[in-house]
Amino acid sequence: MNLTDWLGYIESTHPSTIDLTLERIRIVLERLNLNVSFPIISVGGTNGKGSTCSILESIYKEAGYKVACYTSPHFLHFNERIKIQGVAVSDGLICEAFSKIESAREEVTLTYFEYGTIAAMIIFSEADVDVAVLEVGLGGRLDAVNVFDADCAVVTTVDLDHMDYLGHTREAIGFEKAGIIKPSSAILGIVCKMPAIPKTEPDNFLFRAIKIPKGTPIMIARNKDKPTATKY
């Protein structure tokens, strides 16, 4: 099948377009025995995820690293979602990755986004990249991207979005988005821009409901203010 055929096929394999869970993707990844040895930066938040990914991609590229970037949605071509060194990967590489996923998944159905996420990581692993920047699709805690532990987690903004899936308060939505932060993360980078949150609200309101080790480094940036480094 060509890429157009594959995309039509993967749209039909799962009954729901959005079905937040990590169970299915974990099963398929275990069967693929995918080895992810490069550092991962996961970028979540309500707005600004795509631009943040682009900035990080450019920084790493200019610094001489072989950088991979996975974003969504695409504008014209699916390939735009999966880039290495700022260049969209070929149809052939994506089709090869889809074929491997199809052979491994057996009875497990995957969403369109789950297929794309696994395909991206297969391609990045085989390309031996130095670092990968991954944009969260929806929320964070149960998003397919979050099956890969982030070495650095970036949360851009927290606002009321996708409330049917994430909750009806900023605290509930913040909990879901902050789910990309792992206790094992070597570096934690947080960019907070929450003008609707009262000024008396502590910067760490996102982290109240999740277990972050004391002493974890956090970078706080409020609007255009100079970022400040602190520890949780």
Could you tell me what each predicted segment is?
Residues 1-45, 52-54, 58, 62-63:
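Short functional linear segments
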Residues 1-20, 78, 134-136, 152-161:
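N-terminal-biased segments
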Residues 16-18, 22, 26-36, 62-148, ...:
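ATP-dependent carboxylate-amine ligase catalytic core
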Residues 41, 68-70, 152-154:
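Hydrophobic/aromatic beta-strand patches that form the interior of the parallel beta-sheet core
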Residues 45-48, 135-137:
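Conserved phosphate-binding and hydrolysis motifs of nucleotide-dependent enzymes
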Residues 47-49, 74-75:
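Short active-site-proximal "capping" loops at secondary-structure junctions
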Residues 128-135, 150-189, 196:
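Acidic, Mg2+-coordinating active-site environments of NTP-dependent enzymes
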Residues 188-232:
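Short, strongly patterned local motifs
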